[in-house]
Amino acid sequence: MNRLVPASLTSMLILAAAPAQADHCPTDKLGAMPDRLAEDGTAVAWRTNPAKIAVNRPFSIEVIACVDGEKQMAPTRISVNAGMPMHGHGMNYTPSEKKLAPGNSTFDGMVFHMPGKWQLTFDVYEGETRKRLTRNVTVRR
């Protein structure tokens, strides 16, 4: 009986030291999103709520991101931001993230405070490596 304890303990230590398996991204939801970007094995899909972004009105954005091309793995982290490149400034508010599942988050508190050309920025992280995807959006009064 005493011989089993060290073997069991060794097995537990080996399992604990092994790297965690990465999660697959929710590809079933990825295809259902109205807007998508893909570049070099990284894909991002999203939808806003409300669907039409109004000037100076809060909205949320649900984002799904996948990395590693054919393997379709969930990234370690996603962030969303927006700015007006022609004006050299971003939003006046910082959105808050709510993680729904691996590779799937909602960002609340997005506000485009003035009309014009905005650039949505999606930063998708695989460990410390960041892949940035952008989409231009025009908001009118």
Residues covered by each model-derived region:
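Contiguous segments within soluble domain cores/interaction surfaces
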Residues: 22-119, 123-141
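N-terminal signal peptide c-region/cleavage motif recognized by signal peptidases
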Residues: 17-19
